């Protein structure tokens, strides 16, 4: 029988919530084999047109500083086929809070790679996609079956699949659902979906611990990228109107600002932008915001709300990105929160429930209904995540350069 150990207490009006640990963390091989025999992956498809792209593919590698990654022959070659993002920053250390941020718009104080579960009243990008029936899926290399929730696989020996590199499995609003876990699949299903033209419009792809450079090095990861991504970019079904982001969860040196090598490729990139660079300040939160702006989706009301949009998307919406002075930006630690080991706080951050946000479509109804009447914990309109209590990134300077034809009086 599965048992749950309560880690945190939920007090609804104060936005306090629960985190739980279950025996799903360490299933037996027999339990895995039994589940694998019956687990059915689910591959919904949709065709919702976007402003700048119709499909987004997010591929993450691991733990490499900008400079070594930029020197890798395979990565630098691919970057020249698209747009090199020279000021893309990860959010924190270690790995797991970055993956969490990519799905939930926040780290919730996470500063560890423990087996954590985020309560079901916290929304994710899955909720945003569902507002317009946009298909989504994750593809995790070497995960034993769709919806697997164990901490790792195989159970012994070298790591291959690890839960900490799987964004949506961290959220109970996903894992407690009857269908959503089946959309978190392995690479076998990826190639099946590719063959049968049943890939979703949003994909998050995680190679195993060998291929992502975590347990090896950037040369191994670069070789994997060449084997995996280069053929896909020649596949018309995969690449047509698709935008592919290749980035890293975090840098390797914790004392560095956490700028990570990132580039965009794919059929959605106009010819005149191929082989160019983009110096705009971006974070992992920028991707959540850009997805919302591209498809006309609401915001999570968290750090995605004020995040800069990918320039390709901003140019389509008319949004003016912030110019950020990155000389003192150090996105290498998190703030107090219920997921923190070193700076624990029982209070969960309250998101914004008002405002248009950078994507321009307001806050998701599920977020507004959950947190109605509560004051947001942070200044989520800022393009730079900062925390006054801990002093993280307080005082970072940013400004906008507005070009107005007639009048700027209506611009805020």
UniProtKB/Swiss-Prot annotation:
InterPro entries: Alkaline_phosphatase_core_sf (IPR017850), Phosphoesterase (IPR007312). It is an enzyme of class 3 (hydrolase). The N-terminus is blocked. The keyword Isomerase does not apply. GO terms for biological process: phospholipid catabolic process. GO terms for molecular function: acid phosphatase activity. GO terms for cellular component: extracellular region. It holds the Pfam family Phosphoesterase. Glycans are attached at residues 74, 121, 186, 208, 217, 332, 343. Its EC number is 3.1.3.2. The active site is at residue 215. It catalyses: a phosphate monoester + H2O = an alcohol + phosphate. Keywords: Glycoprotein, Hydrolase, Secreted, Signal. It is found in: Secreted. Gene3D superfamilies: Alkaline Phosphatase, subunit A. Its main location: secreted. Residues 1-19 form the signal peptide. This is Phosphate-repressible acid phosphatase.
């Amino acid at each position: 029988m599965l048992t749950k150990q309560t880690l945190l207490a939920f007090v609804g009006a104060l936005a306090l919530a629960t985190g739980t640990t279950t025996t799903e963390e360490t299933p037996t091989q027999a339990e895995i084999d039994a589940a694998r025999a019956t687990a059915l992956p689910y591959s919904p498809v949709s065709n919702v047109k976007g402003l700048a792209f119709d499909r987004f593919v997010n591929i993450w590698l691991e733990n490499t500083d900008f400079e070594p990654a930029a020197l890798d022959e395979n990565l630098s070659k691919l970057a020249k086929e698209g747009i090199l993002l020279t000021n893309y920053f990860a959010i924190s250390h270690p790995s797991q809070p970055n993956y969490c941020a990519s799905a939930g718009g926040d780290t919730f104080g996470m500063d560890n790679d423990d087996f954590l579960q985020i309560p079901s009243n916290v929304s994710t990008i899955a909720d945003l996609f569902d507002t317009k029936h946009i298909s989504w899926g994750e593809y995790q290399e070497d995960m034993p079956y769709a919806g697997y929730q164990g901490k790792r696989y195989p159970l012994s020996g070298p790591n291959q699949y690890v839960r900490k590199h799987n964004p949506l499995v961290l959220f109970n609003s996903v894992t407690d659902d009857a269908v959503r876990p089946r959309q978190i699949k392995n690479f076998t299903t990826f190639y099946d979906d590719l063959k049968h033209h049943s890939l979703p419009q949003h994909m998050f792809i995680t190679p195993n611990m060998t291929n992502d450079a975590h347990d090896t090095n950037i040369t191994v990861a670069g070789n994997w990228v060449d084997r995996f991504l280069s053929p896909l970019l020649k596949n018309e079904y995969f690449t047509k109107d698709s935008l592919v982001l290749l980035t890293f969860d975090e840098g390797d040196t914790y004392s560095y600002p956490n700028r990570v090598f990132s580039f965009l490729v794919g059929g959605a990139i106009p010819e005149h932008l191929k082989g160019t660079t983009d110096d705009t300040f971006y974070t992992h939160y920028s991707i959540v915001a850009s997805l919302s702006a591209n498809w006309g989706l609401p915001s999570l009301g968290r750090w995605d709300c004020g995040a800069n949009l990918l320039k390709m998307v901003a140019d389509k919406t008319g949004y003016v990105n912030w110019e950020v002075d990155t000389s003192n930006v150090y996105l290498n630690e998190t703030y107090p929160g219920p997921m923190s080991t070193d700076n624990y706080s029982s209070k969960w951050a309250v998101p914004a429930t008002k405002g248009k946000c950078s994507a321009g479509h307001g806050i998701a109804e599920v977020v507004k209904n959950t947190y109605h009447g509560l004051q947001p914990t942070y200044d989520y309109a800022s393009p730079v995540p900062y925390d006054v209590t801990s002093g993280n990134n307080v005082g970072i300077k940013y400004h906008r350069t507005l070009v107005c034809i007639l009048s700027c009086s209506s611009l805020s």
